[in-house]
Amino acid sequence: MIPAERQKLLLNLINQKDVVSITQLAESLNVSHMTIRRDIQKLEEMGKVVSISGGVKMQEHLSFEPTYQDKSLLFHTQKEQIGKFAAQQIPTNTTIYLDAGTTTLEIAYRLIERDDLLVVTNDFSIAHFLMTNGQCELIHIGGTVNKLNHSSVGELAGQFLRQLSIDIAFVSTSSWTLKGLTTPDENKLPVKKALLDAANQRILVSDSSKYGKVATFHICPLTRFDRIICDKNLVEPVQHAIKELTVELITV
């Protein structure tokens, strides 16, 4: 059986269940585990499936952005670990961008003693926290208010960002795969694209639960990032594939 035919059968098998193990797939098609893993890697690169611990599942479509409140309740320990590590990597006398999100808020929590930083953000919760507790200089970029996500979005926000030169951008997302970042909210595109252009170094900060989800609007390929900081639950095949893209991956 040629690979294309086998991969089509794999998709049919995976589509019938929520999660299928490598062993189940190998037995169903009477091929080796190694053959199945190669096929899965190919299907994942095509954006069809997602590797998870112990198996594989169909890629999940994200149709709407979770609210800020909902995000704050999910995977808190992983976000804390990512935020702590990311904050420790920030050099002195740096201009950084903290993208809107609960993971980047964890970075902000660890910057209250830093009086050598200029922090730029589109997140109202981050701005309020640093304005109240921090010693850094602070810029909120303004723009159209997204109340559910406590952030500013749209072309006005993007225009402001295009006037800046940022040393390090810490970028958040609700959906990413090996093909890159996506969003269900078209209004986020101007901000995301402008901050990626404005930054000298781009770091994606995301817990592993966001991996494998895809939304309607494409933001950028994964190769736009210099580094990805994620938790250790990101499965090994995905970690290996990211490193093959020559993007530095750090799991904490």
Model-identified regions with their sequence ranges:
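Conserved SAM/SAH-binding loop
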Residues: 104
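HTH-adjacent hinge/linker in prokaryotic transcriptional regulators
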Residues: 2-5, 9-11, 15-23, 27-29, ...
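Conserved phosphate- and dinucleotide-binding cores of soluble alpha/beta proteins
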Residues: 2-5, 9-14, 18-24, 30-32, ...
